[in-house]
Swiss-Prot record:
PANTHER family with a match to the protein in the record: FMN-DEPENDENT NADH-AZOREDUCTASE 1, FMN-DEPENDENT NADH:QUINONE OXIDOREDUCTASE
Positions bound to FMN: S10, S16, V17, S18, M96, Y97, N98, F99
Database matches in Pfam families: Flavodoxin_2
GO molecular function: electron transfer activity; FMN binding; oxidoreductase activity, acting on NAD(P)H as acceptor; oxidoreductase activity, acting on NAD(P)H, quinone or similar compound as acceptor
Name of this protein: FMN-dependent NADH:quinone oxidoreductase 2
Primary role: Quinone reductase that provides resistance to thiol-specific stress caused by electrophilic quinones.
InterPro entries named among the record's database cross-references: Flavodoxin_fold, Flavoprotein-like_sf, FMN-dep_NADH:Q_OxRdtase_AzoR1, NADH:quinone_OxRdtase_FMN_depd
Disulphide bonds in the chain: none
Top EC class of this enzyme: oxidoreductase
Chemical reaction(s) catalysed: 2 a quinone + NADH + H(+) = 2 a 1,4-benzosemiquinone + NAD(+); N,N-dimethyl-1,4-phenylenediamine + anthranilate + 2 NAD(+) = 2-(4-dimethylaminophenyl)diazenylbenzoate + 2 NADH + 2 H(+)
Natural source organism: Pseudomonas fluorescens (strain Pf0-1)
Length: 199
């Protein structure tokens, strides 16, 4: 049995294309791997606080030095990190907001990219500690940006995943969602075709 962790980050609910992609992924994954455990963390429904002084204090201070706010922030970070550590497969659903990822997803990443936990510093440079995991990134974009200079999603997330040791990363883009007509239909068809090959 494998454990799948899904991170939803779209602010939209019913009309969200990235959420539609997630549901397709879940349906196909369950059909192929009925025994697997799937956990969904919805950052729009339950937002993760952005990196602040309490979280930094929670990381850097000893248990005796932490105040209640710092301890609460550390506990939250530990919960999020433990979910990631336990997962064999990570799925991030990310609409493109202003050429990048939603700030809620960035906040989640800030909680789980932790020295000594998901990566470590060595004499030869940083080393990721999550090797052996797979990641899928499901994106929805109003325009067509893949491979171009305006795409600040894929390069950033590839860098982040590689930094923590996840090098097996598959991106599935639904592009042209705001262009209407044939563009939208083509974008969805291409994304769904790639999803059908995932499981």
């Amino acid at each position: 049995m494998s454990r799948v962790l899904i991170i939803e980050s779209s602010a939209r609910q019913q009309d969200s294309v990235s959420r539609q992609l997630t549901q397709t992924f879940i349906s196909q994954w369950k059909a192929a791997h009925p025994a697997d455990q799937i956990t969904v963390r919805d950052l729009a429904v339950n937002p993760v606080p952005h990196l602040d002084i309490n979280l930094l204090g929670g990381w850097m201070k000893s248990a005796e030095q932490r105040n209640d706010s710092e301890q609460a922030s550390l506990d939250r970070s530990n919960e999020l990190t433990d979910e990631l550590l336990a997962a064999d497969v990570l799925v991030m659903a990310a609409p493109m907001y202003n050429f990048a990822i939603p700030s809620t997803l960035k906040a989640w990443l800030d909680h789980v990219l932790r020295a000594g936990v998901t990566f470590k510093y060595t004499e030869t440079g940083p080393q990721g500690l999550l090797s052996g995991k797979r990641a899928y990134v499901l994106t929805a974009r109003g325009g067509i940006y893949a491979g171009g200079p305006a795409d600040h999603q894929e390069p950033y997330l590839r860098q982040v995943m590689g930094f923590i040791g996840i090098n097996d990363v598959t991106f599935i883009h639904a592009e042209g969602m705001n262009l209407g007509g044939d563009f939208q239909e083509k974008g969805l068809n291409q994304a769904n075709a790639k999803l059908s090959q995932v499981a």
